[in-house]
Amino acid sequence: INLDDKEKSAQKIEYLKKLSLDIIKGVRTATFNLMPPELSDHGIVSSLAKLTQELSKLTGNEILFYNKTSFDKRLDSLVEINIYRLTQEAINNAIKYADSTHIIVQLSHSSTLLSVIIDDNGKGFDVSSVEKKRNSESGMGLLFMKERIQYINGRVFFNSIPGEGTRITFNIPI
């Protein structure tokens, strides 16, 4: 990049940004269906419990898991892997972007719906402004979550108040 030619430099930077986003999208697509052994062997409940324990140990943050309605069924493997990855992404975002120190993952169900709620005590964000930023890393993260949840016919809800934390809710038909 020749810094003397500002216009060409700006074009190259924009190209590199687009290339980086394309690479990120490619990596996410490549890992889309990778299955952790815990998930294939024991199902979503055990896997989420283990995920939260491991991330808590790794990061030093308090990350707790509650199976509020004693859900114990196995789901289709595509549904389980997507719930796992969505939860993993939400926890990682809470740590990476929100500076959260306390994260709670709650799983509950009814006869027709499985719900996973991730609450954090981080700095929160303005949901409407982030959703408009399709080319930023944070905007892309929310977009990928929406795409992944739609893939399993579910819905995602983002509730956040700047300075007060975030709640992400995934509802999946069962």
PLM regions with names:
Residues 1-174:
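Coiled-coil dimerization/phosphotransfer module
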